[in-house]
């Protein structure tokens, strides 16, 4: 479906005359991936729904009605993906070829084995969010030995491993029906702590389901029918501090925390302090925001909790501008300015186009150039970029579970794969991309030209989202040194070059329809 885009002109014209420097400023964090667990600014994350990626070991596939070998009849069942399958793709170079330096995988803990029927459809815990024991593995993904092997394989390729972790809840439960599912039972390395019904120890909240009307309502009531854990209970508090230490000891490099909006802020800050005092790793949380939504509590959490957040403000705006066409580049510029003002560490927020809870960015039958441009923006913007599995293969799918379909292909020749592979390494080679500030340099409804700057390191990116009209760009002033900037993606796409004068002024040039151009500089070394 993507081959027709391989010969399109001027999709990404990445212009580089690398000038004046080869060493990052002293304040820049080390770029080596697995040696720096606390800062992911130089990394590109690849999010994997483990069950939907590769079945590397058929022996651990669930038995009976929980498993669909075709992964097509019912996407709510297990499909067979596991850690061995991820290792296979690590070892064959699929990730390193794309420039990926971190893998975010599904929650690895033991989940319930029950098949739960909702409205006539069987549901399983393939996604990893229906936990029963946070100190054991999900056998459908592999054993502790398999997990250790995954960490080892990733680290041998200088790839970090981030685990999803969902301490907000266990599994579906009903207050009046202990036989529903597995009654939300929580185990401690095989020993039952308690279930939702008959909860005499107060391990869970029993306030009904949240209607999302207030923050407090969402914290102390169940998220849908998921048994909501009481983190103010000392046993639960100790349990999760010990549970995450087990995974830290296994060698993980990062944590994505599910549903942070639905847990007490004070407990999360204390939990993060426990993590940082034990083995600090980069941690980011999920706080969903809808289109054009802002929330002072979201901002406060990002600034005060000790963890970063998935940047839904970035994602929703990029989707509006590039995917849906419902906003202009002025809206994009406004979002970048407001988030830079709101988030103290805006470069540490995790940016993305889509994930397992959203419609995929690529729309069936839509022009793939929109996706490719949005990827280029995400990879060169502030924040830590995360790519959802299959994006590079133009996978489509609206809503759960269609947005979690089986990985469709592992082609390394798609335009999207090559865009990622060319732009991802820039986060290590140019500190402006990893650590820089962002300044708008030229704008209209369709064109956005922005500059990233860190010390004397500069990157200038120009994007024309109009797929049918070119624009003459005049009066553009930058911090780029003088020189001619040529297309480093010439092997993939046909780009143009630009000429910069001594004052940083760019000679008038034409930005092609659907085009993007980036100029990069570093100090002391010149490449012509």
Swiss-Prot record:
Site feature (Transition state stabilizer) residues = 357
Keywords (A to Z) from UniProt: Calcium, Carbohydrate metabolism, Glycosidase, Hydrolase, Metal-binding, Signal
Q: Which family does it belong to?
A: Belongs to the glycosyl hydrolase 13 family.
Which SMART domains does the UniProt entry name for this protein? Aamy, Aamy_C
What are the top taxonomic ranks of the organism?
Answer: Bacteria, Bacillati, Bacillota, Bacilli, Bacillales
What range does the record give for the signal peptide? Answer: 1-28
Which reaction equations make up its catalytic activity?
Endohydrolysis of (1->4)-alpha-D-glucosidic linkages in polysaccharides containing three or more (1->4)-alpha-linked D-glucose units
Concerning Pfam families, the annotation shows: Alpha-amylase, Alpha-amylase_C
Q: Where does Ca(2+) bind?
A: 168, 228, 262
The terms under GO molecular function for this entry are: alpha-amylase activity; calcium ion binding
Q: What is its EC number?
A: 3.2.1.1
Report if keyword Repressor is assigned.
no
Superkingdom of the source?
Answer: Bacteria
**Gene Ontology biological process terms in this record:** carbohydrate metabolic process
Query: Which EC class is this protein assigned?
Result: hydrolase
Give yes or no: UniProt keyword Ion transport. no
Q: What is this protein called?
A: Alpha-amylase
Assembly and binders: Monomer.
Q: Please list the cofactors this protein needs.
A: Ca(2+)
Active site feature = 258, 286
Cofactor notes: Binds 1 Ca(2+) ion per subunit.
């Amino acid at each position: 479906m993507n081959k027709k885009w391989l010969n399109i002109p001027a999709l990404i014209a990445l212009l580089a005359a690398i000038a004046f420097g080869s060493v990052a400023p002293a304040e820049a964090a080390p770029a080596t991936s697995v040696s720096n667990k606390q800062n992911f600014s130089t990394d590109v994350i690849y999010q994997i729904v483990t069950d939907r990626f590769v079945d590397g070991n058929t022996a651990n596939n669930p038995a009976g009605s929980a498993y669909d070998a075709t992964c097509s009849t019912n996407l709510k069942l297990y499909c067979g993906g596991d850690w061995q399958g991820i290792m296979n793709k690590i070892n064959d170079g699929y990730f390193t070829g794309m420039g990926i330096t971190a893998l975010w995988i599904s929650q690895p803990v033991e989940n319930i084995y029950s098949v739960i029927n909702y409205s006539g459809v069987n549901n399983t815990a393939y996604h990893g969010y229906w936990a029963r024991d946070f100190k054991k593995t999900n056998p459908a993904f592999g054993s502790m030995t398999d997990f250790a092997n995954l960490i080892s394989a990733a680290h041998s390729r200088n790839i970090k491993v981030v685990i999803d972790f969902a301490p907000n809840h266990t599994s579906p439960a009903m207050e009046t029906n202990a036989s529903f599912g597995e009654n939300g039972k929580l185990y401690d390395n095989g020993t039952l702590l308690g279930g939702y019904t008959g909860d005499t120890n107060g391990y869970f909240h029993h306030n009904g389901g949240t209607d999302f009307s207030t923050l407090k309502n969402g914290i102390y009531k169940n998220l849908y029918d998921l048994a909501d854990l009481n983190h103010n209970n000392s046993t639960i508090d100790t349990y999760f501090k010990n549970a995450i230490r087990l995974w830290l000891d296994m060698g993980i490099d990062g944590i994505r925390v599910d549903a942070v909006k639905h847990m007490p802020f004070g407990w999360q800050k204390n939990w993060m302090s426990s993590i940082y005092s034990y083995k600090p790793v980069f941690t980011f949380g999920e706080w969903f925001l809808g289109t054009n939504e802002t929330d002072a509590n979201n901002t406060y959490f990002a600034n005060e909790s000790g963890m970063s957040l998935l940047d839904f403000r970035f994602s929703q705006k990029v989707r509006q501008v590039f995917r849906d066409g419902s906003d202009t580049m002025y809206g994009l510029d406004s979002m970048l300015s407001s988030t830079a003002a709101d988030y103290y560490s805006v470069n540490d927020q995790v940016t993305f186009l889509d994930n397992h809870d959203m419609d995929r960015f690529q729309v069936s039958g839509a022009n793939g150039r929109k996706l490719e441009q949005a990827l280029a923006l995400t990879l060169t913007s502030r924040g830590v970029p995360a790519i959802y599995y299959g994006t590079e293969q133009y996978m489509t799918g609206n809503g759960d579970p269609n947005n979690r379909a089986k990985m469709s292909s592992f082609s390394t020749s798609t335009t999207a794969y090559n865009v990622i592979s060319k732009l991802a390494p820039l986060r290590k080679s140019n500190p402006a991309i990893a650590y820089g500030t962002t300044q708008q340099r030229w704008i209209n409804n369709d064109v956005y030209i922005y500059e990233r700057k860190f010390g004397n390191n500069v990157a200038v990116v120009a994007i024309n989202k109009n797929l049918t009209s070119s624009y003459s760009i005049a009066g553009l002033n930058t911090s780029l040194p003088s020189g001619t900037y040529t297309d480093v993606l010439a092997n993939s796409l046909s780009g143009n070059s630009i000429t910069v004068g001594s004052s940083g002024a760019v000679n008038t040039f034409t930005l092609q329809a659907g085009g993007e151009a980036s100029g990069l500089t570093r100090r002391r070394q010149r490449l012509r």
